[in-house]
């Protein structure tokens, strides 16, 4: 399964099934974001800079005017990082999912970041565009560069990307010192928030889609978050960052908890086929609802502490 095909895969399954925590077209796109991040987590990071330009995570060397004054950020994580390092005033366009910090709401909403509206981007007169590293965005980046607009495709899939991408953005925008400070504070907070359990770790199913069941494997943001909070990913042995599993496989592994991203009732819990899973029968769901749980950001240490507290309360 490729990140590039993810949105269409979700669209195909929507008539027969639904995301565990979401409903409706806008939230389907939100699920696409979360899964896109997970599926691309296995890509190696490219070096941050080379002589003559900035090297993005697609390996492209891009000449960027220093510092850009009109940035379109089509990745929620980079929008958050730009504000964190003091470059928020340069952001002139964002996605509908760029919901943090609150000041980002004042930035014009250009719509979807998975399938960007190029005309809306061009209308913003950007001198830098930040795109998620996906096959679909390769053509968009190429078109923008042909028009003389620098475009960087970036991975923001893992906790390790917070400091790395933050420092890259700091150098590009002229906020290197602030970016180094944000990264250092983040690294320290991450170490402090990480839990080393004295007893067995609870097994947590990271379920992001119901029909067919899709889970997060090793190397993803949520996998790292759960591990640092003191749990263990039920499918940590799955080499791919995300994939389809059977309900029978879930039942045989007998998760202690099922992580969901909704605070309300979990609709699939009443479906007959899911009654084979003990955690479903016992309604052992672990809701995590904030945006800090769907993107690597400087808020990740707080997310780890919250998740750790939920794991302890769940027993």
Regions found by a protein language model. Give the residues of each.
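Sec-dependent bacterial lipoprotein signal peptides
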Residues: 2-3, 8-40
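Bacterial Sec-exported substrate-binding components of ABC uptake systems
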Residues: 33, 42-79, 175-205, 254, ...
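Extracytoplasmic substrate-binding proteins
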Residues: 127-128, 132, 138-214, 232-237, ...
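Short secondary-structure boundary segments
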Residues: 75, 133-134, 208, 238, ...
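Short helices/loops that flank or line small-molecule/ion binding pockets
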Residues: 118-125, 147, 244-254
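His/Asp/Glu-enriched short active-site or ligand-binding loop at hydrolase and phosphoryl-transfer sites
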Residues: 95, 218-242, 262, 286-287
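A short, structured surface patch at a secondary-structure boundary
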Residues: 69-134, 234, 274
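Short helix-initiation/N-cap motifs at beta->coil->alpha
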Residues: 55-59, 110-119, 135, 238-247
């Amino acid at each position: 399964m490729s990140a590039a095909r993810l949105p269409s895969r979700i669209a195909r399954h929507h008539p027969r099934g639904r995301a565990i925590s979401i409903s409706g077209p806008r939230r389907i796109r939100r699920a696409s974001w979360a899964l896109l991040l997970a599926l691309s987590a296995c890509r190696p990071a490219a070096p941050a800079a080379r002589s003559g330009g900035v090297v993005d995570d697609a390996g492209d060397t891009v000449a960027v005017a220093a510092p850009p004054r009109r940035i379109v950020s089509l990745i929620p994580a980079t929008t958050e990082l730009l504000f964190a390092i003091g470059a928020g005033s340069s952001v002139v366009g964002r996605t509908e999912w760029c919901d943090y910090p609150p000041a980002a709401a004042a930035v014009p909403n250009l719509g979807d970041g998975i399938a960007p509206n190029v005309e809306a981007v061009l209308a913003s007169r950007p001198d830098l565009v930040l795109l998620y590293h996906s096959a679909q965005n390769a053509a968009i980046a190429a078109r923008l560069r042909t028009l003389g607009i620098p475009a960087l495709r970036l991975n923001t899939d893992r906790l390790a990307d917070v400091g790395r991408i933050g420092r890259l953005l700091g150098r590009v925008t002229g906020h290197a010192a602030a970016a180094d400070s944000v990264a250092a504070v983040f690294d320290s907070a991450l170490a402090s928030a990480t839990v080393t359990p004295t007893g067995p770790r609870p097994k947590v199913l990271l379920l992001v889609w119901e029909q067919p069941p899709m889970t997060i494997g090793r190397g993803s943001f949520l996998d790292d978050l759960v591990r640092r909070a003191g749990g263990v990913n039920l499918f940590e042995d799955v080499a791919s960052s995300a994939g389809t599993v059977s309900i029978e496989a879930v039942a045989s592994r007998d998760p202690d908890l099922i992580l969901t991203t909704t605070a309300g009732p979990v609709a699939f819990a009443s479906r007959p086929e899911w009654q084979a899973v003990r955690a479903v029968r016992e309604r052992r769901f672990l809701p995590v609802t904030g945006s800090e749980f769907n993107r690597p950001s400087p808020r990740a240490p707080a997310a780890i502490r919250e998740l750790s507290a939920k794991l302890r309360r769940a027993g």
